[in-house]
Amino acid sequence: PSVNQSPHSPQPPHSPPKLTELRPTDIDEITKLVLQSPTKQCELDPIPTSLVKQSISVLAPIITNIINLSLSSGTFPSSFKLSVVTPLLKKPNLDKNNFSSYRPISNLSFLSKLTERVVKDRLSAHLSKNSLFNTFQSAYIPFHSTESVLLSLYDSIIRAISKQQVTCLCLLDLSAAFDTIDHSILIHRPLIISYFQSFHLDVC
């Protein structure tokens, strides 16, 4: 400690390790991800997903090279950002002539979704390895779900009751929560690298 600093003075918060690069993928990982993927079709796909699976031994090296070029260059290809948007009525009783009654469902190409999966796995591994997930978070964490939240909540209530304590529960549900966030703020956080800036730029 410095002359003016007590040994017991509060220390500055620990800065989490930065995610500066994305580890390249390989043929084995791509093969596994492709075979595990749902056989869904998108109008933007040049060939059916089922055919990609059947020909994975031939296509895996090509797909691996394309995704690795995207990762190494820090650029999410513009063609991967294109999607087929289908308006879906939120509730049966809503006004069908009102645009706000619909939820836009975007269907991306198979290669785009595959690239997202590769990046997601690396980001999740980084967050997990460095203990960056919130202690009470259940979303986007392997082996966690809404059931995890309910079990934790139930356990807390039971413990409080056993101690004759009063329990108050406040629930907050934000409509279109992600859309209310300024994405430019998110992608400028220290943990986010240029790849994610490229991902959110000019999404169609």
Label each region the model flagged.
Residues P38-I47, N98-N107, V149-H188:
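Conserved catalytic palm subdomain of right-hand nucleotidyl-transferase polymerases, strongest
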Residues P1-S100, S106-L114:
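Surface-exposed loop/turn segments and immediately adjacent short secondary-structure elements
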Residues G74, N130-S131, Q164:
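Short glycine-centered helix-capping/turn motifs at secondary-structure transition points
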Residues N68, A177-C204:
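Catalytic-core region of right-hand nucleic acid polymerases
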Residues E116, S124-Y140:
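Electropositive, glycine- and tryptophan-enriched low-complexity nucleic-acid-binding patches
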Residues K90-K91, L111, D121, L172-L174:
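Residues immediately flanking
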